[in-house]
């Protein structure tokens, strides 16, 4: 850290004289960022690093005028970035959509950095919340509504439709149900759902690229209602797809359901990864390691951490009243990933396709309840696309 003139430390609760400044902030032109010691700087890092992300995002926006575009769409907004596959972003993104003030909002909705202070307060803990009967009813409601919204998105998927159009429909469907779309502004995510096409593993940002015949696309939906989040996703075929896509999507769904079949009190969370990886590898696929399932209720992401790969070190044993997601991401090639310069879009490093399915689950006395299950059918949407 660089030495600076005498100032007061910016760590919450510290009024010591500050002699150091964050070197990254200096490079990015961020004013302030003074600390009294390395210890204070490290203690503030979880919050402070979000300033770096915001500054980089704003810099990228300022560079829009220098883009080379086809018509009004730019498919190469990050000069010099080497894409791992054929997919390209279609920028600029449409403006962030507003949520009416009468809809209850999570704590991060209006935070300038999209930070959830309630999640940060529990970061690092492995204690898993046991939900009360009131909590469980709240989760049942929001998960049912989230399922309704995903089913609406499913009906839109066909060649020529953009993921931006899907996001718009999702946003309106959330509002119509008096729900907040949980992804919106979560650590500054700019849209109301995630749409992940082909080599995108997860957290794809909806844009103006039309879906193409032969694509696969995952739509990830989370709603917030009465203080609770409900989370699910499915992968869909776009028109006719090749046999490799069919096998990948079918196997990914089987990985999820085999893991769900094992959920009951007394099972260690780390066992789920063994089940998922065994089935994926038996079919010639790999399991993403960077992204995991998670606890969910009044917090969007919390304990337990639920890895999908084998021999993981996840902490915790299932008990009746736990609620969490399982959401395996399965790849045609290697499991290694990287992230686009937008800071969100996770893609396979080798450019091969990835698929995902997710449910939110309640552990019961004898097994589990799939809170995000379809009510009109026992099977996911892709099975009706065969």
UniProtKB/Swiss-Prot annotation:
<feature type="binding site">
    <location>
        <position position="40"/>
    </location>
    <ligand>
        <name>Zn(2+) 1</name>
    </ligand>
</feature>
<dbReference type="InterPro" id="IPR001714">
    <property type="entry name" value="Pept_M24_MAP"/>
</dbReference>
<keyword id="KW-0378">Hydrolase</keyword>
<feature type="binding site">
    <location>
        <position position="327"/>
    </location>
    <ligand>
        <name>Zn(2+) 4</name>
    </ligand>
</feature>
<keyword id="KW-0862">Zinc</keyword>
<dbReference type="InterPro" id="IPR002467">
    <property type="entry name" value="Pept_M24A_MAP1"/>
</dbReference>
<feature type="zinc finger region" description="C6H2-type">
    <location>
        <begin position="6"/>
        <end position="59"/>
    </location>
</feature>
<feature type="binding site">
    <location>
        <position position="231"/>
    </location>
    <ligand>
        <name>Zn(2+) 4</name>
    </ligand>
</feature>
<dbReference type="GO" id="GO:0070006">
    <property type="term" value="F:metalloaminopeptidase activity"/>
</dbReference>
<keyword id="KW-0479">Metal-binding</keyword>
<feature type="binding site">
    <location>
        <position position="14"/>
    </location>
    <ligand>
        <name>Zn(2+) 1</name>
    </ligand>
</feature>
<dbReference type="InterPro" id="IPR000994">
    <property type="entry name" value="Pept_M24"/>
</dbReference>
<feature type="binding site">
    <location>
        <position position="301"/>
    </location>
    <ligand>
        <name>a protein</name>
    </ligand>
</feature>
<feature type="binding site">
    <location>
        <position position="52"/>
    </location>
    <ligand>
        <name>Zn(2+) 2</name>
    </ligand>
</feature>
<comment type="similarity">
    <text>Belongs to the peptidase M24A family. Methionine aminopeptidase type 1 subfamily.</text>
</comment>
<dbReference type="InterPro" id="IPR031615">
    <property type="entry name" value="Zfn-C6H2"/>
</dbReference>
<dbReference type="GO" id="GO:0005829">
    <property type="term" value="C:cytosol"/>
</dbReference>
<dbReference type="GO" id="GO:0004239">
    <property type="term" value="F:initiator methionyl aminopeptidase activity"/>
</dbReference>
<keyword id="KW-0007">Acetylation</keyword>
<feature type="binding site">
    <location>
        <position position="22"/>
    </location>
    <ligand>
        <name>Zn(2+) 2</name>
    </ligand>
</feature>
<feature type="binding site">
    <location>
        <position position="25"/>
    </location>
    <ligand>
        <name>Zn(2+) 2</name>
    </ligand>
</feature>
<feature type="binding site">
    <location>
        <position position="231"/>
    </location>
    <ligand>
        <name>Zn(2+) 3</name>
    </ligand>
</feature>
<dbReference type="GO" id="GO:0022626">
    <property type="term" value="C:cytosolic ribosome"/>
</dbReference>
<feature type="binding site">
    <location>
        <position position="358"/>
    </location>
    <ligand>
        <name>Zn(2+) 4</name>
    </ligand>
</feature>
<dbReference type="InterPro" id="IPR036005">
    <property type="entry name" value="Creatinase/aminopeptidase-like"/>
</dbReference>
<keyword id="KW-0863">Zinc-finger</keyword>
<dbReference type="Pfam" id="PF15801">
    <property type="entry name" value="zf-C6H2"/>
</dbReference>
<keyword id="KW-0031">Aminopeptidase</keyword>
<feature type="binding site">
    <location>
        <position position="203"/>
    </location>
    <ligand>
        <name>a protein</name>
    </ligand>
</feature>
<feature type="binding site">
    <location>
        <position position="294"/>
    </location>
    <ligand>
        <name>Zn(2+) 4</name>
    </ligand>
</feature>
<dbReference type="GO" id="GO:0008270">
    <property type="term" value="F:zinc ion binding"/>
</dbReference>
<comment type="function">
    <text>Cotranslationally removes the N-terminal methionine from nascent proteins. The N-terminal methionine is often cleaved when the second residue in the primary sequence is small and uncharged (Met-Ala-, Cys, Gly, Pro, Ser, Thr, or Val).</text>
</comment>
<feature type="binding site">
    <location>
        <position position="358"/>
    </location>
    <ligand>
        <name>Zn(2+) 3</name>
    </ligand>
</feature>
<comment type="subunit">
    <text>Associates with the 60S ribosomal subunit of the 80S translational complex.</text>
</comment>
<dbReference type="GO" id="GO:0006508">
    <property type="term" value="P:proteolysis"/>
</dbReference>
<feature type="binding site">
    <location>
        <position position="48"/>
    </location>
    <ligand>
        <name>Zn(2+) 2</name>
    </ligand>
</feature>
<feature type="modified residue" description="N-acetylalanine">
    <location>
        <position position="2"/>
    </location>
</feature>
<feature type="binding site">
    <location>
        <position position="36"/>
    </location>
    <ligand>
        <name>Zn(2+) 1</name>
    </ligand>
</feature>
<dbReference type="Pfam" id="PF00557">
    <property type="entry name" value="Peptidase_M24"/>
</dbReference>
<protein>
    <recommendedName>
        <fullName>Methionine aminopeptidase 1</fullName>
        <ecNumber>3.4.11.18</ecNumber>
    </recommendedName>
</protein>
<keyword id="KW-0963">Cytoplasm</keyword>
<feature type="binding site">
    <location>
        <position position="220"/>
    </location>
    <ligand>
        <name>Zn(2+) 3</name>
    </ligand>
</feature>
């Amino acid at each position: 850290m660089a030495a600076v003139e005498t100032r007061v430390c910016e760590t919450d609760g510290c009024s010591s004289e500050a002699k150091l400044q964050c070197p990254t902030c200096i490079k990015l032109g961020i004013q302030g960022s003074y600390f009294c010691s390395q210890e204070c700087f490290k203690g503030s890092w979880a919050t402070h690093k979000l300033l770096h992300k915001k500054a980089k995002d704003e810099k990228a926006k300022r560079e829009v005028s220098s883009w080379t575009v086809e018509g009004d769409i730019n498919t190469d907004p990050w000069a010099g970035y080497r894409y791992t596959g054929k997919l390209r972003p279609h920028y600029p993104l449409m403006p962030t959509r507003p949520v009416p003030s009468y809809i209850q909002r999570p704590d991060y909705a209006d935070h300038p950095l999209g930070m959830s202070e309630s999640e940060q307060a529990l970061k690092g803990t492995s204690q898993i919340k046991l939900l009360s009967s009131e909590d469980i009813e709240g989760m049942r409601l929001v998960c049912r509504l989230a399922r309704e919204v995903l089913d609406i998105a499913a009906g839109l998927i066909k060649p020529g439709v953009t993921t931006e159009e899907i996001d718009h429909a999702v946003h309106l469907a959330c509002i119509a149900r008096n729900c907040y779309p949980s992804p919106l502004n979560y650590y500054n995510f700019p849209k109301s759902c995630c749409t992940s096409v082909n080599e995108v593993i997860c957290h794809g940002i909806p844009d103006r690229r039309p879906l193409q015949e032969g694509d696969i696309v995952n739509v990830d939906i989370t709603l917030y209602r009465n203080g609770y989040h409900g989370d699910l996703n499915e992968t869909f075929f776009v028109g006719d797809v090749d046999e490799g896509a069919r096998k990948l999507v079918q196997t990914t769904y089987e990985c999820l359901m085999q893991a769900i079949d094992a959920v009951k009190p007394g099972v260690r969370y780390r066992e789920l990864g063994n089940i998922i990886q065994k089935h994926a590898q038996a079919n010639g696929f790999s399991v993403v390691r960077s992204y995991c399932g998670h606890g969910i209720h009044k917090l969007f992401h919390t304990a337990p951490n639920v890895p999908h790969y084998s021999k993981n070190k996840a902490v915790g044993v299932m008990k009746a009243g736990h609620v969490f997601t399982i959401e395996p991401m399965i790849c045609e090639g290697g499991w290694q990933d990287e992230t686009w310069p937008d800071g969100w879009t996770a893609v396979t490093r080798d450019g091969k396709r990835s698929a995902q399915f997710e449910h939110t689950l309640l552990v019961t006395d004898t097994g589990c309840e799939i809170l995000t299950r379809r009510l009109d059918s026992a099977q996911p949407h892709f099975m009706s696309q065969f």
